[in-house]
Curated annotation (Swiss-Prot):
It comes from Escherichia coli O9:H4 (strain HS). GO terms for molecular function: 3-octaprenyl-4-hydroxybenzoate carboxy-lyase activity; metal ion binding. Its main location: membrane. Binds 1 prenylated FMN per subunit. The keyword Protein biosynthesis does not apply. The lineage of its organism: Bacteria, Pseudomonadati, Pseudomonadota, Gammaproteobacteria, Enterobacterales. Its cofactor is prenylated FMN; Mn(2+). This is 3-octaprenyl-4-hydroxybenzoate carboxy-lyase. Mn(2+) binds at residues 172, 238.
Length: 494
């Protein structure tokens, strides 16, 4: 499935009953969030609010509110197919030359996909059909949502922020929330280790006192949106990855006021700059932890131009205690992570980020254990291999006889295979999510690893327990006579 733009994707969703148009007037202040939250928790469709109160621009919510729609956005039929996306990323992260003709033939599809990586630059684009600049710029005309009662102000949530460092050819795409503080002013909340913030820091060092160009695209095609939240290798641009997903080159266009390139089909583009030293207090906002975060200062983004399509659609979301849209994305992208981790650690059987763990704060890993201390090596690998897991607070490692996605299995392994003192690893003074108020210092906290594997010689001096297993002959016999027993009157029981 290929989508040229967001509207193509919405057409398909509507045809499949995955999009609901809301014609009743609904307020972007709190009301859209309430409707979207109820719908997402019920596994419902994407929502297009055609008449937001006080605005003429429709609001799109819950676009990726189910794992199925995330898979569709990546051009796949279902979530299980996302493993193939992960295998492609693993290949791109550490490409290997073919070992022979047969291997070359097997890898041919991957090499063919690479042809879609370069971007296609357009002279004109749909995202520039309407242009507003200077004093005419007014962000208040966009139906920016206020999601929770104690939120400080309306908040842009799905903007793809485009930046470029002074020493880089490649642009960075990142998703950072942006608080509305004026008709042409937003607060750019990016954490110091994120790509946009790093580009900004390098710019300030190379060009002291000079304005840093920034553009924000809203309502890009699904492949580009998802490319910005997927763990692409550092050497691969998000646009290139979007081309791989889509099967066609990503079309971009140069901005009106700067040299940054934005998705040509985006619904809305905000162009402007950050003035070094211009900061503002951001928050509080309800976030994916289920709490309001503390107030902190971040750079101010001044918008000089707004370009948009005719009849533009504003793409938005909310974040709150899981399940929310980021949690759903986490469930789907979990399938992408598995092959990438297995490429580096072949002993990994499965990897799971429970959505109730706020998408990434707790990971369960199952392995084919091969030696004493193996579980601890895997813990350290998870924390260090992909930057997406630098904020993971808890890593639980189990044997491959445990289902990583079944809490009954995981809790059984923890309570029967762990000694708290011997099998718990604590690491202090590590990077922690700024939003994690449980850490003693903002951005710095501890991590815990739990070794819930069977212990090998060298890890214990005691005889290890042998799991109870049923007699297969008895099981087969009881299966054969189960219906005659009529215990439940409905055939076999679990």
């Amino acid at each position: 499935m290929k989508y040229n733009d967001l509207r193509d994707f919405l057409t398909l969703l509507e045809q499949q009953g995955e999009l609901k148009r809301i014609t009743l007037p609904v307020d972007p202040h709190l009301e859209i969030t309430e409707i979207a939250d109820r719908t997402l928790r019920a596994g419902g469709p994407a929502l297009l609010f055609e008449n937001p109160k006080g605005y003429s621009m429709p609001v799109l919510c819950n676009l990726f509110g189910t794992p199925k729609r995330v898979a569709m956005g990546m051009g796949q039929e279902d979530v299980s197919a996302l493993r193939e996306v992960g295998k492609l990323l693993a290949f791109l992260k550490e490409p290997e030359p073919p070992k022979g003709f047969r291997d070359l033939f097997d890898k041919l599809p991957q090499f063919k996909q690479v042809l879609n990586m370069p971007t296609k630059r357009l002279r004109g684009a749909p995202c520039q059909q309407k242009i507003v600049s200077g004093d005419d710029v007014d962000l208040n005309r966009i139906p920016i949502m206020t999601c929770w009662p104690e939120d400080a102000a309306p908040l842009i949530t799905w903007g793809l922020t485009v930046t470029r460092g002074p020493h880089k050819e490649r642009q960075n795409l990142g998703i950072y929330r942006q608080q509305l503080i004026g008709k042409n002013k937003l607060i750019m909340r990016w954490l110091s280790h994120r790509g946009g913030a790093l580009d900004y820091q390098e710019w300030c060092a190379a060009h002291p006192g000079e304005r840093f160009p920034v553009s924000v695209a809203l309502g890009a095609d699904p492949a580009t949106i998802l490319g910005a939240v997927t763990p692409v290798p550092d050497t691969l641009s998000e646009y290139a990855f979007a081309g791989l997903l889509r099967g066609t080159k990503t079309e971009v266009v140069k901005c009106i006021s700067n040299d940054l390139e934005v998705p040509a089909s985006a619904e809305i583009v905000l162009e402007g700059y950050i003035d070094p030293g211009e900061m503002a207090p951001e928050g509080p906002y309800g976030d994916h932890t289920g709490y309001y975060n503390e107030v902190d200062s971040f750079p101010v983004f001044t918008v000089t131009h707004i370009t948009q399509r005719e009849d533009a659609i504003y793409h938005s979301t909310y974040t709150g205690r899981p399940p929310d849209e980021p949690a759903v994305l986490g469930v789907a992208l979990n399938e992408v992570f598995v092959p990438i981790l297995q490429k580096q650690f072949p002993e990994i059987v499965d990897f799971y980020l429970p959505p109730e763990g706020c998408s990434y704060r707790l990971a369960v890993v199952t392995i084919k254990k091969q030696y004493a201390g193996h579980a601890k090596r895997v813990m350290m690998g998870v924390w260090s291999f992909l930057r997406q897991f630098m904020y993971t607070k808890f890593v639980i490692v189990c044997d491959d006889d445990v289902n990583a996605r079944d809490w009954n299995d995981v809790i059984w392994a923890i309570t029967t295979r762990m000694d708290p003192a011997r099998d718990t690893v604590l690491v202090e003074n590590t990077p922690i999510d700024y939003l994690d108020f449980a850490s003693p210092v903002s951005g710095l906290g501890s991590k815990m690893g739990l070794d819930a594997t069977n212990k090998w010689p060298g890890e214990t001096q005691r005889e290890w327990g042998r799991p109870i297993k049923k007699d297969p002959d008895v099981v087969a016999h009881i299966d054969a006579i189960w219906d005659e027993l009529a215990i439940f009157n409905n055939g076999k029981s679990a």
